[in-house]
Amino acid sequence: ANEGAYIYIPKNVEVEKPIQIINFTTGNDVATMIQPRNLIVVEENAHVQIIERHQSLTDNAVLTNSVTEIFAAKSATVDFYKIQNDKDNASLVDNTYIEQKSNSVVSVHTFSFGGNITRNNLNFYQRGEHIDSILKGITIIEGKQHVDHHTLVHHIEPNCESHQDYKGIFDARSTGVFNGKVIVEKEAQKTNAYQQNNNVLVSDKATINAKPQLEIFADDVKCSHGCTIGQLDSDALFYMQQRGIPKKEGKALLMYAFANTVLESVKIPEVKQRINKLIAAKLGVHIGFDL
């Protein structure tokens, strides 16, 4: 299909195996633009895991402008994994909108490892109480690649939570943006919102622009945000070299450890294994175990 996917999960249904949405782009000798739209409806007390991948099979320029809408009904659970590891000729603008009802849990993990320009716009709207929204991501890029993460969590009603944790590793002349926004409305008392963005610049020519934002109109909330930008711990790297670990492998291990907090929350073993392999490939080393 070239128009996206429609996924409907009925009430009280738990889908045993993950559903995959794989976007293949082919072309002859011309640049290609595609605009898929995915609609995912998960009814009350239903549970589903979804994996989305983008893959270009052409050497010509490709632009994908995608929209995904997820509606999670009362007590629904959705785990969504985005794997972005495309060629340098491919660019992606990914727009995801999620509406949650009471007692629902939705997690979105975004793994950005390739492509020319990637922009992830991720928007959560909490329309009920006791909702949990989880946003996590890992970015590892090099060359002149660019990745944007723009997130929004809109707390509209009381007694809800959101958790954001994004890690970035930038090499060569790569650039990145993290713009995370949390809005807590006046009625959304007892909100618990956490936002953290940590970045490592492997090259002194790499750039990351980070802007965590909180807009709080309620007075009984627990909200925090933070951002760090730095380089690998030279002391830790020296310590590893003193114990016989080559510098290249030592750097890889430090980066694995840096990203591990995001990988820990991946619930599908095959996805976790694949992401581990992608990280190792991006770092250019072979590590004989998973962290």
Question: At which residue positions do the language-model features occur?
Answer:
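Conserved beta-strand/loop scaffold segments within soluble protein domains that form the structured core
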Residues: 1-238, 242-245, 259-291
